[in-house]
Amino acid sequence: MLVNAPLSADTENEVRTKSEDVDPNVMADVLKAVIARVKKIDRDHDIPYIAGYSQNGEKIYIDRHMPKSAKLGGKRVQTDRFLILHEAVEKALLDELGLHYLHAHQIALRTERAAVEAEGHAWREYNAFTKAHERQIDDENLKKVPDDLDLTPYRNEKDFQKLQQMVAAIKSEE
């Protein structure tokens, strides 16, 4: 189980800021460490709810229509890393701790928010950006859904119509 994994020298080197308090520099280290563990980022598919992960957790999927950046506070900000953090945390909580999707999602969302705010961006502005695109993405006609996408979030949300569309899109790709 992941939570019993011993610390390695590499893991120790990822900690550049030593603080047990809420600290933006620690969150920057966390963001880099999590992203370094993701084996593949895929932006070639249609992914309802903006982003998701493969069943084995090795890939993070971001919808092909989701912009890679947003204008936040007047600055262009790359946003994929926040989505990757969210999805990686959510998947780890589902697989390693066996949490229900809604609980895993809440913790992942709060982690995403902490990362956004640690970089000095307003959560309200970032969240408005993601929600606006989530509505567009959810309304799209699904054509390219990966066959290894973990469907747990869609099953737990009881979004059966979306599940049917996804399964049909997967079958049409085969």
Model-derived regions: residue spans:
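Residue-level marker of positions within ordered structural domains that often coincide
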Residues: 1, 89, 113
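Low-complexity, glycine/serine/proline-rich disordered segments
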Residues: 1-15
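Exposed, low-complexity/repetitive linear segments and helix-based recognition motifs
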Residues: 9, 84-87, 109
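Metalloprotease/metallohydrolase-associated module, dominated by Zn2+-dependent proteases
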Residues: 12-79, 95-174
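Active-site recognition of the HExxH zinc-binding catalytic motif
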Residues: 82-94
